[in-house]
Amino acid sequence: MKSNEILNFFKENPVQYLSTIGLDGKPKVRPFQFMLEEKGKLYFCTCNKKRVFEEIKGNPYVEFCIMDKNMDWLRTSGKVIFAEEFSIKKKIIESNKLVKEIYKSYNNPTFEVFYLEETNFSMNYMSEVMEQESKL
């Protein structure tokens, strides 16, 4: 799968499911939303008051799962790196109405932005047995 196909899959399927290891050591899954891509990095955001933030700090290895209308799905795993660049935070705030309503400003101290490093992708087709693995 090519990097532009991966990016389009994220954009075309706005709800992704993020899997973490909970504070109790058990898996946790919740809906998330891809924010933007910059220099080959996939960016997401959260609030540092949420449990998911603490879970990621405790174990930065996560996996996203995204399914399209054809029931094909993309698994994306990697290591979370928190980004402090105000330029990225500003782009996210300016491009997402809901995020702007929640955080008001890119310098809100609870607004956290992260990207994935050591990223692996696995495309799975309902009609096929094989997985296609790739990197961005």
What are these regions (language model features)?
Residues 17, 42-43, 122:
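General beta-strand recognition
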Residues 9-23, 62-66:
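A short, Trp-centered hydrophobic/proline-enriched beta-strand micro-motif
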Residues 32-35, 78-80:
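Hydrophobic/aromatic beta-strand elements that line small-molecule binding cavities or substrate pockets
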Residues 35-71:
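A short mixed-secondary-structure module that forms the rim of ligand-binding clefts
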Residues 1-17, 134-136:
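Extreme N-terminal tail/first-helix region
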Residues 13, 59, 96:
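Acidic-histidine catalytic/liganding microenvironments
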Residues 75-136:
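Charged, gly/pro-rich active-site loop segments
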Residues 24-26, 79:
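Residue-level signal for well-ordered, solvent-exposed loop/turn and beta-edge residues enriched
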